[in-house]
């Protein structure tokens, strides 16, 4: 499996708790890169988008979807967490992300992002019942949905995800709750999810693998580690590679 990165914005740090990051934007690069890939005759099995800094970048991803219509289209609609938009994102990102999600095969919002896409009141903590209901409604936007960061599973002892498919059965995946919150775990989850699907796993099995790996990353990270700096991803990679 070979990944081709298409940078949308360069940030000196992420936007959570590290002050105001320096931002590098090159709006001409993305369209030029896509045109170059097309001239080369490249074929992509999947197009997966994450953090997008402004609505024009959502349009760039839509352009990629149109150029490679047979690719699996996965969108992590990075908008916010903890009941609010991420710092640096304007309210105009919500309709832009909604439109992008409507062109995807699979979307992976957290409970806050699910509420933003649906126009629901922003949640503090997402219950499993609320997440299941939101996931089902989100299948009107995209045919496959996974809502992450769902608490309240097993009387609060677990955290997990709720999945739904248009016209299909819903499901939930849970892992033991470790009471620590690290930045970047959503990106790790999405990367493993997409990788497992491309290896031929059905979405529920891919979600299970991704959730288990994130849990392992947190377990491998010593308590007291600055949560803003993320998990010790490398320590958990051998177990993922053995699966």
Question: How would you label these PLM feature ranges?
Answer:
Residues 115-116, 180-203, 207:
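Short, small-residue alpha-helix embedded
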Residues 170-183:
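Short pre-catalytic strand/loop immediately N-terminal to key active-site residues, enriched for Gly-Thr
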Residues 9-11, 53, 79-81, 113, ...:
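Glycine-rich beta-alpha junction loops
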Residues 1-87, 236-242:
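Conserved N-terminal subdomain of the carbohydrate kinase-like
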